[in-house]
From Swiss-Prot:
Nucleotide-binding keyword on record: no
Higher taxonomy: Eukaryota, Metazoa, Chordata, Craniata, Vertebrata
Domain of life: Eukaryota
Expression across tissues: Highly expressed in placenta, small intestine, spleen, kidney, thymus, liver, salivary gland and testes. Weakly expressed in breast, skeletal muscle and colon. Highly expressed in breast cancer upon interaction between tumor cells and stromal cells in vitro. Expressed in blood mononuclear cells from patients with systemic lupus erythematosus (SLE).
UniProt keyword Coiled coil, yes or no: yes
Keyword list, A-Z: Coiled coil
Name by which UniProt lists this protein: Epithelial-stromal interaction protein 1
Stretches the record annotates as Disordered: 1-60
């Protein structure tokens, strides 16, 4: 294999003494210069006379003017060619082994075991039933959608019912706490009033006990004056609470009535839809039976005078 080596410039590597001197009288300036052919001949003649280190290192090289030609390595070239041929042979062998095999199928009759008449009747029956299948499919999807909506509505009702129960429980706890605080406050005020009354009038109480001693052995609390402002405030609070309870009960009743009305309306719609579906189903069945009866009778169409065909077309909604 021929490869190009780096360019060796003979003029740059030569010493100044070895360079040819130019004669000043030579106008062309070519005196002392050799042609490429003469330079090659001199190089070939000088090689056997004085073998240098470069000639020993670059064995098998040949100088051609400013380039050096290297002879190919025969053994390496043969080895590369042998490996390439072996790889090509292996590739062809692999292709031959992995080639797609022919497909052998058992011949059989197309169309199955049914006759053409049976297949056509089956196709006609499927075509006639496809309309009703689509209708049933739509009704089924509507029913599933309504069931999902009803489940969602029941879920929302349960959530609202739970919220109302929690609100009632919270109000009941608040009312119990309020009553407990009021009872404690009342007991505290009563005890304070009694202690103040006992400290301010000990003589009067002793006198009353001495006067009333022989007559009665039990001592009764004096009748306290009623605080009208406190009574009015508590009456106002009780009235507000009663008003709130009445409004809450009214809202519950309205919500219950609305839910009952919605349930009644839904039931009526379901009944109407069932009636319509039943009527349509009966009409279609009658039309289908009429058509079958007309086909079974040999002179059915001629006897009716074409009126049966018109009625059957109207019955099918055409």
């Amino acid at each position: 294999m021929n490869t190009r080596n780096r360019v060796v410039n003979s003029g740059l590597g030569a010493s100044p003494a070895s360079r040819p001197t130019r004669d000043p009288q030579d106008p062309s300036g070519r005196q002392g210069e050799l042609s490429p052919v003469e330079d090659q001949r001199e190089g070939l003649e000088a090689a056997p006379k004085g073998p240098s280190r470069e000639s020993v290192v670059h064995a098998g090289q040949r100088r051609t003017s400013a380039y050096t030609l290297i002879a190919p390595n025969i053994n390496r070239r043969n080895e590369i060619q042998r490996i390439a041929e072996q790889e090509l042979a292996n590739l062809e062998k692999w292709k031959e082994q992995n080639r797609a095999k022919p497909v052998h199928l058992v011949p059989r009759r197309l169309g199955g075991s049914q006759s053409e008449t049976e297949v056509r009747q089956k196709q006609q029956l499927q075509l006639m039933q496809s309309k009703y299948k689509q209708k049933l499919k739509r009704e089924e999807s509507v029913r599933i959608k309504k069931e999902a909506e009803e489940a969602e509505l029941q879920k929302m009702k349960a959530i609202q019912r739970e919220k109302s129960n929690k609100l009632e429980e919270k109000k009941r706890l608040q009312e119990n706490l309020r009553r407990e605080a009021f009872r404690e406050h009342q007991q505290y005020k009563t005890a304070e009033f009694l202690s103040k009354l006992n400290t301010e009038s000990p003589d009067r109480s002793a006198c009353q006990s001495a006067v009333c001693g022989p007559q009665s052995s039990t001592w009764k609390l004096p009748i306290l004056p009623r605080d009208h402002s406190w009574a009015r405030s508590w009456a106002y609070r009780d009235s507000l609470k009663a008003e709130e309870n009445r409004k809450l009960q009214k809202m519950k009743d309205e919500q219950h009535q609305k839910s009952e009305l919605l349930e009644l309306k839904r039931q009526q719609q379901e009944q109407e839809r069932a009636k319509i579906h039943q009527t349509e189903h009966r009409r279609v069945n009658n039309a289908f039976l009429d058509r079958l009866q007309g086909k079974s009778q040999p002179g059915g169409l001629e006897q009716s005078g074409g009126c049966w065909n018109m009625n059957s077309g109207n019955s099918w909604g055409i």
